[in-house]
A protein has these predicted regions:
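NAD(P)-dependent short-chain dehydrogenase/reductase
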Residues: 10, 14-68, 73-77, 81-84, ...
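A recurrent short beta-strand within the Rossmann-like NAD(P)-dependent oxidoreductase core
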Residues: 34-35, 58-61, 68, 80, ...
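C-terminal "lid/loop" region of Rossmann-like NAD(P)-dependent oxidoreductases
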Residues: 94-98, 109-112, 120-141
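Hydrophobic/aromatic residues within transmembrane alpha-helices
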Residues: 144-145
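Amphipathic terminal alpha-helices
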Residues: 155-168
Length: 168
């Protein structure tokens, strides 16, 4: 099966490489991990947890041992600003690639527990009610270099609090 998302990322890198070589373009690639924040319309994990909390529905999930590395949107924005400043400083020779991650991976089960603690709720989750997906990533890739001058500062607990505060 062809993964079109991966194919478009590879095509982007090839086109970018062409312009780096022919137009002396300077580039910083930021590889984003799981991002989250208030008003996220993508239907990602935190929106799902919030829906479960307010509806009381039960959700069958995997056993929950896969790890996630969520990065709050404000930290992602700061990474883009740091990358821009690095490009402006003329230290980038051609292309640099950095990982934008919290550096604090957490198991899905533990993330849900953190969410429950932050919301003073208990979600109706049937852990192990469905199998892991084919090719489930159990541990996020962690060998990418961190952008100089940047680190994630918003903890998971603080990020969840900010999401909840934005709903008021």
């Amino acid at each position: 099966m062809v993964n079109l998302y991966a194919a478009t990322k590879q095509a982007y890198r090839s086109i970018l490489r062409y312009y780096i070589e022919t137009a002396n373009l300077k580039v910083i690639n930021l590889e984003l991990f799981d991002t989250y924040g208030p008003n996220d319309q993508r239907g990602k994990l935190f929106a799902l947890l919030d829906r479960l909390r307010t509806s009381g529905d039960t959700l069958a999930m995997s056993p929950g041992d896969q790890q996630l590395d969520p990065v709050y949107i404000d930290d992602v924005s700061e990474a883009f600003i740091a990358a821009f400043k690095r490009l402006r400083s003329d230290v980038v020779q051609d292309e640099e690639t950095y990982s934008v991650r919290s550096q604090n991976p957490i198991k899905l089960k533990d993330l849900v527990k953190t969410y429950e603690d932050a919301t003073s709720s208990t979600l109706n989750i049937e852990w192990g009610g469905r199998p892991y997906r084919a090719r489930e990533v159990m541990v996020p890739w962690s060998r990418g270099e961190t952008l100089p001058g940047w680190s994630s500062t918003v903890t998971l607990q603080e990020g969840i609090k900010r999401i909840l505060d934005s709903d008021v």
